[in-house]
């Protein structure tokens, strides 16, 4: 019995080493990868590479405070679609999220919060933002908008899910 399980374990382990994509990838169709681009209602289809890059960069640069789409410093505001669309200006498309990551403002849009929120504008205070290009910010924005399609109510849902 032990020999059968050890042989099966060895086979699975070898497959994971030879082709790690068998374990870690999911195929997302174009409809799933389609996210809002701008306020005019245009959309963009993220490439699989942009999806991977966005996830990696979000986890490295934003995930400490926004794990699962929540905001640890302000539990009343998350990254779920409703909260993004009700912000002023609305942050429910990639261009608006890129603008926010460059120059963050309060939820009502009246005050700059660059000194307390990581951004390109405050890269001297928040070193994680220093090396991010516009393409990186685009991928992060795409990741934020893609997550509600993949995690549904869990994204931005708060403590009850995490």
From Swiss-Prot:
Keywords: Chloroplast, Electron transport, Heme, Iron, Membrane, Metal-binding, Photosynthesis, Photosystem II, Plastid, Signal, Thylakoid, Transport. PROSITE patterns: CYTC. Residues 1-25 form the signal peptide. It is a peripheral membrane protein. Its main location: plastid. Its cofactor is heme c. GO terms for biological process: photosynthesis, light reaction; respiratory electron transport chain. Heme c binds at residues 62, 65-66, 117. GO terms for molecular function: electron transfer activity; heme binding; iron ion binding. GO terms for cellular component: chloroplast thylakoid membrane; photosystem II. Binds 1 heme c group covalently per subunit. Pfam families: Cytochrom_C550. It comes from the Eukaryota. It is found in: Plastid, Chloroplast thylakoid membrane. One of the extrinsic, lumenal subunits of photosystem II (PSII). PSII is a light-driven water plastoquinone oxidoreductase, using light energy to abstract electrons from H(2)O, generating a proton gradient subsequently used for ATP formation. The extrinsic proteins stabilize the structure of photosystem II oxygen-evolving complex (OEC), the ion environment of oxygen evolution and protect the OEC against heat-induced inactivation. PSII is composed of 1 copy each of membrane proteins PsbA, PsbB, PsbC, PsbD, PsbE, PsbF, PsbH, PsbI, PsbJ, PsbK, PsbL, PsbM, PsbT, PsbX, PsbY, PsbZ, Psb30/Ycf12, at least 3 peripheral proteins of the oxygen-evolving complex and a large number of cofactors. It forms dimeric complexes. Belongs to the cytochrome c family. PsbV subfamily. This is Photosystem II extrinsic protein V. It comes from Guillardia theta. The gene is psbV.
């Amino acid at each position: 019995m032990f020999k059968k399980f050890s042989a099966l374990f060895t086979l699975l382990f070898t497959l994971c080493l030879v082709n790690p994509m068998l374990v870690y990838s999911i195929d997302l169709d174009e409809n799933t990868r389609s996210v809002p681009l701008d306020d005019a209602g245009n959309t963009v289809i993220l490439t699989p590479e942009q999806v991977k890059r966005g996830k990696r960069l979000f986890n490295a640069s934003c995930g400490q405070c926004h794990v699962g789409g929540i905001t640890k410093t302000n539990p009343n505001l998350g990254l779920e679609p409703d909260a993004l669309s009700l912000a002023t200006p609305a942050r429910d498309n990639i261009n608006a999220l890129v603008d926010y990551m460059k120059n963050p403002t309060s939820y009502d849009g009246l005050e700059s919060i660059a000194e307390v929120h990581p951004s390109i504008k405050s890269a001297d205070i928040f070193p994680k933002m220093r090396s991010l290009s516009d393409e990186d910010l685009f991928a992060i924005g795409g990741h934020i908008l893609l997550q509600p399609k993949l995690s549904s109510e869990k994204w931005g849902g708060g403590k009850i899910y995490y």
